[in-house]
């Protein structure tokens, strides 16, 4: 085998928005409100093999802005930021961390920009998503699997208020 055949391969083939939706159920009246909304942020990751060394990784965010006093949704935006990655010459037990940690870390800044841009274009102040520690989420998931626990929600899903 030549040296190039033994080197790990990691290539970003494509980064794109697979799905994007925005709902403003109480428009246009909601734009007259002065109350600061409560922001709820949910994040999930998934991945699947497409073909051989090609993998699809999806980071999904759902952001809901709600007026607490009136119990009204100002807006709800959901985005599926997706990447196609080529991963080769990597030991089998190391592929999962690449798909669960490295790839979501690459996709998250794009997702953050998509959410912020969509919300701003809808006429609201931008929503800035805080950084996410995908490594901690991955290790938590592995610990739960080792302990045989069934979490209330998948370990690769987080909710923030």
UniProtKB/Swiss-Prot annotation:
The keyword Chaperone applies. Signal peptide: none annotated. Transmembrane segments: none annotated. InterPro entries: SecB, SecB-like_sf. Keywords: Chaperone, Cytoplasm, Protein transport, Translocation, Transport. It is found in: Cytoplasm. GO terms for cellular component: cytoplasm. One of its GO terms (molecular function) is unfolded protein binding. GO terms for biological process: protein folding; protein tetramerization; protein transport. It comes from the Bacteria. Residues 141-161 are annotated as: Disordered. SUPFAM superfamilies: SecB-like. Its main location: cytoplasm. The keyword Zinc does not apply. Belongs to the SecB family. One of the proteins required for the normal export of preproteins out of the cell cytoplasm. It is a molecular chaperone that binds to a subset of precursor proteins, maintaining them in a translocation-competent state. It also specifically binds to its receptor SecA. Homotetramer, a dimer of dimers. One homotetramer interacts with 1 SecA dimer. This is Protein-export protein SecB. It comes from Nitrosomonas europaea (strain ATCC 19718 / CIP 103999 / KCTC 2705 / NBRC 14298).
């Amino acid at each position: 085998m030549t040296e190039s055949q033994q080197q790990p391969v990691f290539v970003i083939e494509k980064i794109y928005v697979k799905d994007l939706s925005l709902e403003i159920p109480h428009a246009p009246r909601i734009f007259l409100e002065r109350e600061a909304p409560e922001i709820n942020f949910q994040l999930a990751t998934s991945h699947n093999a497409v073909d051989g060394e090609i993998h699809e990784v999806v980071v999904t965010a759902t952001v809901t802005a709600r007026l607490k006093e009136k119990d009204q949704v100002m807006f709800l935006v959901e985005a599926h930021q997706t990447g196609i990655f080529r991963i080769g010459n990597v030991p089998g037990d190391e592929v999962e961390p690449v798909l669960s940690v490295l790839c979501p870390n690459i996709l998250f800044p794009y997702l953050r920009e998509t959410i912020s841009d969509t919300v701003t274009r809808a006429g609201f102040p931008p929503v800035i998503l805080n950084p996410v520690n995908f490594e901690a989420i991955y290790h938590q998931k592995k610990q739960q699997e080792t302990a045989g626990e069934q979490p209330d929600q998948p370990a690769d899903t987080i909710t923030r208020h």
